[in-house]
Amino acid sequence: MVNEYKRIVLLRGLECINKHYFSLFKSLLARDLNLERDNQEQYTTIQIANMMEEKFPADSGLGKLIAFCEEVPALRKRAEILKKERSEVTGETSLEKNGQEAGPATPTSTTSHMLASERGETSATQEETSTAQAGTSTAQARTSTAQAGTSTAQKRKIMREEETGVKKSKAAKEPDQPPCCEEPTARCQSPILHSSSSASSNIPSAKNQKSQPQNQNIPRGAVLHSEPLTVMVLTATDPFEYESPEHEVKNMLHATVATVSQYFHVKVFNINLKEKFTKKNFIIISNYFESKGILEINETSSVLEAAPDQMIEVPNSIIRNANASPKICDIQKGTSGAVFYGVFTLHKKTVNRKNTIYEIKDGSGSIEVVGSGKWHNINCKEGDKLHLFCFHLKTIDRQPKLVCGEHSFIKISKRGNVPKEPAKEEDHHHGPKQVMVLKVTEPFTYDLKEDKRMFHATVATETEFFRVKVFDTALKSKFIPRNIIAISDYFGCNGFLEIYRASCVSDVNVNPTMVISNTLRQRANATPKISYLFSQARGTFVSGEYLVNKKTERNKFIYYGIGDDTGKMEVVVYGRLTNVRCEPGSKLRLVCFELTSTEDGWQLRSVRHSYMQVINARK
């Protein structure tokens, strides 16, 4: 039973709460678990679950976790789920101790009961309903079952076999299981089957999966999943036409959905379900098929809106992985016939008589996409983004290529105008935002009295760039040029993104590929012309590199005259920046200087977070 408690703590508790609440939970249990304060953020959910099992042997710390969730308004639904799971474990144990028989309407598996209680559509509840309608008591059901030749003890044994996976292994050996000859074994199996049935109440069990005979609507080797699965919709395309093998024109759409532990690509062949496949919508799907790791929903499938108490919490890491595109170098290493999805930059387009070759490119390499039929010579040009859905990897002329198939789809994002100014965001943002580091300063002390330190950085997405203030210098190791990171819980203020804690920045370990155009890089690193600064509003913060042609020291201030081919301006520094030695003829790098004006003209004035560096001193 202790193992059951730990399973609930880990898989239904710690893995389902976000990073902020997990950090809060660790902080509250730091003394009980003897967590080192400096390394508190480093402990993983598995490590914490192991410590809780050792510290609280009675229930593996489940009571502590429930109490914590009840005190946090956003986690109260999670507390109810945990209490329901706990009651199932204690109820099941007492049932076994009393030697009671579990009837067909009383499943002993915690997972299957959670499905029944949360969705109300398991076969067990249906049997209970039909038994009640027939007016048959439990004793009568047992008697009739015994008369049919199956004793209650045998039923109990079968249920135990199902819980331990025996039935799944038997099903794999049945002769009517269609072979998967087109893909390696790992790709033939459903992603759902790769997870333990105890991992989540949302994962269908093997007893409700059936191999289907081949026909015109069901792909060969498809597996039917009749048990309900609760998912959150992440993305969905508009419906589009495709030609079936029978040369009929039909409609479908692609979608991406996620559970608490994994994500799935979905083919939806019933376009009347489009309204349900809306971003961030929670739905319950059943009677769907799985083929080569992709879920398929047709007219016989059930798609229902989830009730408020059936909604799930999808971790940000799952969402990031679902939205990430594979590296092209990894695609090239894939198995022939493998299916790929992703967003890529069009590098070159070659139109042939029967097909079009779209060469896509990222930081790891390039590959050709072969488009024929409706994907022949589509309206796109170099620099556009191609969002590929369901493209097949094939070897043509000894080279791996992505080839369109029956259900392939391409969504085009036109290249927009490259911004000249850094993007501005205001207030608190939870994120995460995935960016590439372009440029970074050295850490410096901006408050000499309290020894406060920071550094500046420039980062970019594929469409815009940002100025960043980082107030935790331990993050310098992550802010390395060309490194791709995810930032969260940051603040937007005066044209800068402000990051205060190390926990707000994480490495992007899954498919860290981002294509930043040369034009965007140039704009992000460019120095604004002085004539352009004359047209800007007072209070604008300026960064750039300028040639110094004059220097004047007056009281506690230093005045530098700077200029370019469009005009001249004055830079005023005071305090700590007066210690930077710079003479006329040198070049100054200015970061975060405020544009202001006096009676004599425009000035760039140093402020609390300004940074100044001499690029090349006069010889």
Swiss-Prot record:
Motif (Nuclear localization signal): 150-157
Record has DNA-binding as a keyword: yes
Inducing stimuli: By beta interferon. By macrophage differentiation factors. During myocyte differentiation. By different bacterial infections such as Staphylococcus aureus or Mycobacterium bovis.
Compositionally biased tracts (Low complexity): 122-153, 190-206
UniProt keyword annotation of Ribosomal protein present: no
Chain positions of Sequence repeats: 134-140, 141-147, 148-154
GO MF terms, alphabetically ordered: double-stranded DNA binding; transcription coregulator activity
Tissues where this protein is expressed: Present in osteoblasts (at protein level).
InterPro entries named in the record: DAPIN (IPR004020), DEATH-like_dom_sf (IPR011029), HIN-200 (IPR040205), HIN200/IF120x (IPR004021), NA-bd_OB-fold (IPR012340)
Chain segments carrying region Disordered: 86-223
Annotated segments matching region 3 X 7 AA tandem repeats of A-[GR]-T-S-T-A-Q: 134-154
Biological processes annotated in GO: activation of innate immune response; cellular response to interferon-alpha; cellular response to interferon-beta; innate immune response; inner ear development; intrinsic apoptotic signaling pathway in response to DNA damage by p53 class mediator; positive regulation of osteoblast differentiation; regulation of transcription by RNA polymerase II
Result of knocking out the encoding gene: Deletion mutant mice display increased susceptibility to Staphylococcus aureus pulmonary infection.
Ranges of residues in domain HIN-200: 213-413, 417-615
Compartment(s) of residence: Nucleus; Nucleus, Nucleolus; Cytoplasm
Major subcellular site: nucleus
Assembly and binders: Interacts with UBTF. Interacts with RUNX2. Interacts with ID1, ID2 and ID3. Interacts with STING.
Function of the protein: Interferon-stimulated protein that plays a role in several biological processes including cell differentiation, autophagy and innate immunity. Cooperates with CGAS to sense dsDNA and activates the STING-dependent type I IFN pathway. Mechanistically, gets acetylated upon bacterial infection and then translocates from nucleus into cytoplasm to recruit STING for activation of TBK1-dependent IRF3 nuclear translocation and IFN-beta release. Inhibits the transcription of ribosomal RNA. May inhibit DNA binding by UBTF. Inhibits cell growth via p53/TP53 and RB1-dependent and independent pathways.
Domain comment (free text): The 2 HIN-200 domains are able to interact with RUNX2.
Protein name: Interferon-activable protein 204
